[in-house]
Amino acid sequence: QYGFSLQGSVGSKDWEVFTAILVNDRARRGDGADLVNYEVKFATIGSSFEYQYHRNRGLNKLTDDRDVDHIFVTRSETYMNVEVWLVERTKMIPIFDRWLPELIQNYEAADRQRFRRSVTYGFVRNQGVRLLEITGGELRYFLETT
């Protein structure tokens, strides 16, 4: 309909830029959270959001994730439906606290390079605040933030 191929998917940096514009934030320099005040995750609607921690920086990354709020962007396969949710760090901290001993144990094995966990779409909907919703290509909801 709009003249673009839907082969492949929108990259993570594109979702980070979209989110930065939406919440008036900036990219964070170096490793850690994606934006100064937010970690950005994206998935198709109904799917879980993956958190991945690499061996060399995993512990620092998990600590950084505890210190920021989290934005979750979901989309349909056609990109005609998009939801953006904000989950405050206080609601995420118990999850990260649960993952911490698992992360440490994971890296006791010398061959382990990554530690992956996920947050469910249901958790995001139950604990989050909806910031934006596009349905059928039409803006249906936008929460003005100050």
Task: Indicate residue ranges for each PLM-predicted region.
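Nucleic-acid endonuclease domains
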Residues: Q1-N37, F42-T146
